[in-house]
């Protein structure tokens, strides 16, 4: 006979629920940090002692009164929602009233807090497994809250043994802090591991100032920050912020820094991630991935957070609308802007050029403030090695590689209009495999048998129409890839070759066309197209600030 179905005891129910919320040291840190941010803290101090299974989070937020301290660790007690309607108006990071109670189920909880609204003294409170106070006493302290969770998972040895290694848990904690610091750049973070300083993050006005502190290889001017105000389909106001690593300056070998946040929390959204990758398609070399942080600040009524205990999965209304806005903001970020046409990141290459003539001296190139009219007046003045166009503007000059600049122009033209035109005389190809024939048909080529191991092609991409190497280009197209790959191949083969002499008019035409492209920074293979040399950098190199003497007329 099967065992009878019984009602679980409250103790078992609570422990199961706690395991959904608190499953690691990182989860404890996450929940306490979210509470601190909800309390409007601007400074967080976190201490982790793995050997003691102890986490302490101190903040300078609003703090709690003794009355709130008596209820805050009880199950389903919260100040953030009151009724069912509030579930669709959530503006806080926490709202379920589960975190502190869940910590009491898996460890020992102590809270010190002082209400910021006029209380002269704080309170120190210890809790039992039911979230009830077992000890309370006054505690002199500044306004804010200090939460200590210790002996975590001590009553569940099987759970503790099944957790990742301490090293892995510390990595997870660092990743969580990285994410939260990007979402809340106004906060100062000080993190200790075994009482030794481990992480420090200074505050900033935007996440563009935070990201270089997290990725030491990335500089402030390697990044483009945009903030767009958007009217949603429900006619409410929202904001979309993006920090994008400019593809000609920084990238990653792994897809680990493509981050999406919604209303202060990093979330997983495969469809939005694919939208970002599609928007950055053909801007990075093969095997390289973008550095990107995208933050949606949208009305809470358009989000359902109540889908995952860690709130990392959400339902977002009008997802197609937001995908379109993401594509638009990426296009804007890739444009040549006044603040990013020359950079500290690019200057690493400039420094190598300038230092080739001397062993000492570092010439930093500052941020250019060339306005949009100056960009329009970019003027071709010469050609170097029949490869690089020398272009002058009011604050310096650029070196533009002619082949890949033209390749970018042609590629975007092909993207906008993939035009196949009939040819008067069929182009004969031989020794094609079945897969090659299928590939040509897949990209729209009209091909038919023309004898044994021979094929006749009746139409070709317009750019290849009058080229002598058109048969070779068709064979290249037959070797695989999607339509985008074919467009890149055609653009590359059709672009002006390096080693071709151009006159000033041809160079100027190319510069004008190149500046109008959606992504003038890199070619479709991900190579940088231009190098900027500021006049101020050249001036420092030639010591134009030196005072030699009046007799020299300087």
Curated annotation (Swiss-Prot):
Q: Which Pfam families match?
A: DNA_mis_repair, HATPase_c_3, MutL_C
The intrachain disulfides are none
Q: Which GO terms describe its cellular component?
A: mismatch repair complex
Q: Which GO terms describe its molecular function?
A: ATP binding; ATP hydrolysis activity; ATP-dependent DNA damage sensor activity; mismatched DNA binding
- Gene3D superfamilies found in the cross-reference section: 3.30.230.10, Histidine kinase-like ATPase, C-terminal domain, MutL, C-terminal domain, dimerisation subdomain, MutL, C-terminal domain, regulatory subdomain
What is the superkingdom listed in this entry's lineage?
A: Bacteria
Which SMART domains does the record match to this protein? Answer: DNA_mis_repair (SM01340), MutL_C (SM00853)
Keywords tagged on the record: DNA damage, DNA repair
The UniProt entry, under InterPro entries, shows:
DNA_mismatch_repair_CS (IPR014762), DNA_mismatch_repair_MutL (IPR020667), DNA_mismatch_S5_2-like (IPR013507), HATPase_C_sf (IPR036890), MutL/Mlh/PMS (IPR002099), MutL/Mlh/Pms-like (IPR038973), MutL_C (IPR014790), MutL_C_dimsub (IPR042120)
> In its UniProt record, which GO terms are filed under biological process?
mismatch repair
Role according to the record: This protein is involved in the repair of mismatches in DNA. It is required for dam-dependent methyl-directed DNA mismatch repair. May act as a 'molecular matchmaker', a protein that promotes the formation of a stable complex between two or more DNA-binding proteins in an ATP-dependent manner without itself being part of a final effector complex.
Q: Which HAMAP family match?
A: DNA_mis_repair
Which family does the record assign?
A: Belongs to the DNA mismatch repair MutL/HexB family.
* PANTHER family cross-referenced by the UniProt entry: DNA MISMATCH REPAIR PROTEIN MLH, PMS, MUTL, DNA MISMATCH REPAIR PROTEIN MLH1
Q: Quote the protein name from its UniProt record.
A: DNA mismatch repair protein MutL
Q: Which organism is it from?
A: Crocosphaera subtropica (strain ATCC 51142 / BH68)
The organism's lineage is: Bacteria, Bacillati, Cyanobacteriota, Cyanophyceae, Oscillatoriophycideae
Q: Supply the gene name.
A: mutL
